[in-house]
A protein has these predicted regions:
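C-terminal structural cap/anchor segments
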Residues: 98-150, 174
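Short beta-strand elements
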Residues: 200-213
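Surface-exposed coil/turn segments at beta-strand junctions on protein surfaces, enriched
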Residues: 93, 129-131, 170-172, 184-186
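A contiguous, surface-exposed recognition patch within enzymatic or periplasmic domains that forms
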Residues: 1-99, 105-107
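Short, aromatic- and glycine-rich surface loops/edge beta-strands on solvent-exposed regions
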Residues: 186-197
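Short, hydrophobic beta-strand segments
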Residues: 177-184
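Solvent-exposed serine/threonine-rich low-complexity stretches and specific carbohydrate-binding patches
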Residues: 161-171
Length: 213
């Protein structure tokens, strides 16, 4: 409802993870897949690169509530382990009728036209400069930025953010943001990053959950 677009990265955590995103009258939510090359999965039978994204677009105001994301740990690829749903702020009472009108779409991309840069790829690994830190690399579509020089806003719910840089990669058509996350003893942290311009956000708000494994 706030017209802020969030891109929450999914991860294979070893423990159950539940995330809740508060909103009022959400414009849409779902599970989207952007890695569309065979090389991303190398599975000639399942052909994961051809799997559709699922998107729910509410048709009426749903009021206040949360989009809840559940990530269930699994031992193999055959178990479906990602769940996303809307939970109203007010408790639903037994015997009452509630109407939630929506459009459910299955397509390569969600059927919207948000005029901001989308996250193309997320990568992470141990920092080469700090053995206790982890490096995150986020690539965005470059075309949306034009001549604007965005400023990265990076946050962590626990721990701290170390060195970061923003780099244009015109040959790849990407804008790359890289930063170090330092846990500082934290066992869990929600990380976020957005690229801002003079008029506000120029990109999706990237969100990831880090857990100490």
């Amino acid at each position: 409802g706030s017209e802020q677009r969030l891109w929450r990265v999914l991860s294979g955590h070893s423990t159950l993870q539940v995330s809740a995103f508060m909103d009022e009258n959400p414009l849409g939510f779902g599970l989207a897949q952007r890695a569309r090359s065979f090389d991303a999965y190398q599975d000639a039978e399942a052909r994961y690169e051809k799997r559709p994204s699922a998107w729910i677009a509410p048709q009426d105001g749903w009021g206040k509530g949360t989009v809840t994301l559940v990530e269930i740990p699994v031992q193999n690829e055959f178990n479906d382990n990602i769940v996303s749903y809307w939970q109203p702020a007010d408790t639903l009472k037994a015997g009452e009728r509630y109407d939630f009108n929506y459009m459910l779409s299955f397509a390569p991309e969600p059927p919207d036209s948000a005029p901001i840069a989308r996250v193309v790829e997320t990568m992470s690994g141990q920092s080469v400069n700090n053995a206790t830190a982890r490096t995150f690399v986020i690539d965005y579509d470059l075309d949306v930025f034009g001549s604007d020089d965005p400023v990265a806003q990076i946050k962590a719910s626990a721990g701290s953010i170390g060195h970061s840089y923003l780099l244009r990669m015109p040959e790849q058509g990407r804008m790359r943001l890289a930063f170090e996350y330092i846990p500082d003893g934290a066992k869990l942290a929600d990380l976020s990053a957005v690229l801002n311009g003079a008029g506000g956000a120029l990109s999706e708000t990237w969100i990831a959950r880090w857990t100490r494994e």
